[in-house]
Amino acid sequence: MPLDVLLLGVQGAGKGTQAKRIASDFGLAHIATGEMLRDAIADGSELGRRVQPILESGELVPDDLMIELIRERLQSEDAENGFVLDGFPRTMPQAEALDSMLADIGRPLSVVFELQVPDDVAVERLHLRAEQEGRADDTPEAIEKRLELYHRETEPLVGHYRLLGNLVGIHGNRPENEVFAEIQQAVDQARVAS
């Protein structure tokens, strides 16, 4: 049975960092929607031209566009044995579309992690990332907008996955290795249960 993992959490919670480690440690495809969109912008593709102003303003990319992007990516050969989703879903319609996509192929999510960090810690991490990486979407205005959108649009997904019974809350305001050790333990338990 494939191992399919989803990471939720406010921007700056450490989703990208932990997703890379999970993918590497368990041999899973790392599906990072933010990275996919930034690559499309860098390539100058039609998709990139459409999403660049959206990302730079801190807004969410429209559901239909994100759902199609994920649908295509989940059909890739490297995702057959499992994947880590980082940055999708961000809205209830996206979550429902993902549930439907996975049900169609008989692959329910193995485990959903909510990386929990206080907003002030997330903001501090994002400002540091902006200084170190110079990402155009990490301006103070965009960060504030993304936090607001997370609490309004994405945070309700925590309740959705809690009802489905596969949500694991992880306190992300700790050293990276401690967070990952707890994630590893939960993934091992999810594998045994499936």
Regions found by a protein language model. Give the residues of each.
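Glycine-rich phosphate-binding loop of ATP-dependent small-molecule kinases
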Residues: 1-194
